[in-house]
A protein has these predicted regions:
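Long, contiguous binding/interaction regions
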Residues: 1-93
Length: 93
């Protein structure tokens, strides 16, 4: 599947950077919330065996996804992005 097709399956908040990686910044209220989200993403990453780069700063988490083995984007990066999107979606009671 082409990047353009896969791109349509994830949140528009993800940027495709130089055709090489996906990046999304999530704004949060404080450092603790950013760290908590990073830990939740880490749990998903461990289960999937696909690990994003996570940059935690005050009130912000930057998530970067690419496949190291090919030094670029793979379908697995988009699958992981969709899983992160699901985590960030507000739950409906």
């Amino acid at each position: 599947m082409a990047i353009a097709e896969l791109r349509g399956q994830i949140s528009p908040e993800w940027a495709v950077v130089n055709g090489h990686h996906l990046e999304r910044q999530v704004k949060l209220k404080n450092f603790g919330q950013a760290m908590a989200l990073a830990n939740r993403i880490a749990e998903i990453a461990e289960r999937q065996g696909h690990h994003p780069d996570l940059l935690v700063s005050w009130g912000r988490l930057t998530v970067t996804l690419f496949t190291h083995a090919i030094d670029g984007l793979h379908q697995n990066d988009f699958i992981m992005a969709a899983r992160i999107d699901a985590l960030l979606r507000p739950s409906v009671p």
